[in-house]
A protein has these predicted regions:
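Beta-propeller folds
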Residues: 21-274
């Protein structure tokens, strides 16, 4: 390919020559007869549709081998054609990144006995959550995303929610480490740094503490990635003992739970995507 790129005669038709040398990825045709409303047609590519696509989101190894192979070929082909733009890609990336203040802090907000705020640094990719007692100058770090990712040793690390209990003792956090948007909830004792509740799986990520801080409320995702159930979890107990407190029967709606600003009421919201 380098020969053709440097040859004056071939330079005009370099893309045609590359297509010959580096075969354009072709998705295999597997004809299948479809019919609907008295109309019949042949679909060559319906085979790539996986009925268990949500399972693939949870575990990428379940992707059809032929589909994976085709996607990898497409990526390789694209990378080759865009290799001459790597410098401009980096330049654009650096320019956009340069407009973001990486070393930054949010304004503090007061919650019960503490002031809370977050900060980011030039060295880290994730935020740090800090707090200090209202009558103290001692700053306490209760969450560091980069350290948490390092402990888990994962490639993907998505943070869903960070919530502190009303008694300021517990930190509830939810993580997606697969990119599936199914979040796992954990409860940590801030003082001892020990995990009290190890895993509540396949949730939306939202965490709401009860006023007595004995429980949390959360929404569970079903196999179709819909949040139709709200559970109550006793902190320190096992997920299998969680109590279902609300279920939306309509598949068109999703549910969530939140606490009113005066902390007197819990709201269960059910709505469609509109």
């Amino acid at each position: 390919i380098n020969y053709y790129e440097n040859n004056k005669y071939c330079k005009k038709n370099i893309h045609i020559l590359i297509d010959i040398i580096m075969k354009i990825p072709q998705l295999e045709k597997k004809p299948e007869i479809k019919s609907c409303h008295n109309t019949t047609w042949e679909d060559n590519y319906s085979w790539i549709h996986q009925t268990d696509i949500l399972e693939v989101l949870k575990d990428s190894s379940k992707l059809l081998p032929d589909v994976r192979k085709y996607l990898e070929e497409e990526n390789a082909y694209t990378d080759y054609h865009l290799k001459n733009t790597k410098d401009i890609q980096k330049k654009l990336f650096d320019e956009i990144k340069g407009r973001i203040k990486l070393d930054d802090e949010s304004l503090p907000y007061r919650d019960h006995s503490y002031d809370y705020w977050t900060k980011t640094t030039t060295k880290g990719n994730y935020s740090i959550k800090l707090r200090k007692k209202i009558d103290s100058n001692e700053i306490e770090e209760i969450w560091n995303g980069d350290k948490e990712k390092e402990k888990l040793n994962v490639e993907y690390f998505g943070v869903g929610d960070l919530e502190v209990s009303n008694n300021d003792r517990y930190l509830g956090f939810s993580l997606d480490i697969k990119g599936s948007e199914y979040y796992t909830i954990y409860i940590r004792d801030i003082k001892t740094n020990k995990i009290i509740t190890k895993e509540i799986t396949e949730t939306t990520g939202g965490i709401t503490f009860s006023l007595d801080d004995k429980y949390i409320f959360y929404s569970k995702l079903d196999e179709n990635h819909r949040a139709r159930k709200i559970f109550r979890h006793e902190i320190g107990n096992f997920e299998k003992k969680d109590e279902l407190i609300f279920e939306e029967k309509s598949e068109a709606f999703s549910v969530s739970i939140s606490l009113s600003s005066d902390e007197k009421y819990y709201f269960i919201n059910t709505s469609d995507h509109n």
